[in-house]
Amino acid sequence: MDERFYDAYQRIWELPRTGEVRVQMGQESAFKKNLFGAIRDLGLDRDHHRITNRGLYKKFHEGLIEIAETHGTDLTEDELRGHFQTKKSGIFSNWLGTPPDTYKLVFPIMIRSKHFPDEVELYESKAEQIDEDQWENHLIAAENDDDSSFDSFLDELPNDYSDHPLKRREWTFLMVEMKARDEFYALHRVSELVEIRFAEINFFDQLWAAGMPQPGSSDRAPYEKWTRHQEPPFYLIFQDGDFVTYRPMDFDYRRSVGRFHFNHADDVDEISDIPTFDYDADKGTYEGYIVSALLAYQDGITERSVRQSFFSFWRGIEILSNTSDYSNASDFDKMVDRGEFALSYHHDMDDSLRPELKRAIEEIEEKRHELVHEGLKTEIHQGHRNGAKLLLDGLLLLYIDKYGQWDLNDMSSFLKHGVEYQEKVQFLTTLLTDLS
């Protein structure tokens, strides 16, 4: 038995007046530190067992309290060892030795239901629309739970709701089922799947959008077409029909997020056709490159700060440009060149680029050299961010188009030789222009 389990046990006492057995007041932090430390060193595979350390903490916390209730709070370490091993074996056999439970997570997203399919794949699960009556039943169950602060949480939400919270046409209500051994794993896994799915949806919906240029004489903030829809404001978690807990997820939930609309709202059925990728794919694989770049794209497309948005897109370009070393000027050039080639590959080698797209690319070409010399201190404005997004658009679409057909070596070779071909074409075009 890890001595930290005994240290945690020693911080349990029996209240003199009520006889309640609990962790001593003022000892909660030390109790938690010891218990979590011992649990982490058990080395259980989170995804294999579909558990979290937090779920294990809850089980072992309950187990130590039960031992203290049955055998007292003054056992020696040797006396505790036998009782603890019995309790630990029970936890492992009765909990880890049986199939995981099914948890149901319901949540709102700020998209009109008519713009969202009835069902969307989430790699290992699916998100299904529920109607307003079903949503209201779940909402009431959470509001009426005496042990939950959800009712107070709802009062803090900023959006202009109708008479009943969240009951309005701008919202879609979704339900996802997830196999898990504790509610924390269910929440963790579903939030991962929702994050990558929204990254995929946002990517295809915002493809080739470059934003609107800021008028030179105006102090007005530029109109942005990009979405802030990064994750639901909260999840409600249920098991066997009973409300378990809620979890706020969008940590800007107190700030009004306004309405969200798809650029391609008429193409709602196409959302179901958008490919899904494994959130847990090895980062060194072709699929892992796509997932990492999609998450960088999601950060960029939902980030308010132009500067932070730019560097999120830039991180995606670094991943997909497939260069070996980003610390020198030549590889910064490779990153931009390969991004430009991927972009032009989808636009008939530059002939069909809209004027605002060309301006954005010119901005990023100028910025690449400052990034080498000034690094993170360099000034970033909207045009640079737009250019970085477009380069990532081109690279991501190319990777997704060739998914299942090419490997990383194939892609690297295509980008390398594509840039060389493009440079030769540009050289010949310039030469012929000069001669004429």
Predicted segment positions?
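Short acidic alpha-helical/loop segments enriched in Asp/Glu that coordinate divalent cations
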Residues: 307-313, 322-342
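Polyanionic, low-complexity intrinsically disordered segments
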Residues: 1-93, 326-328, 340-342, 352-367, ...
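Residues at structural and domain junctions
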Residues: 286, 299-303, 350, 354-357, ...
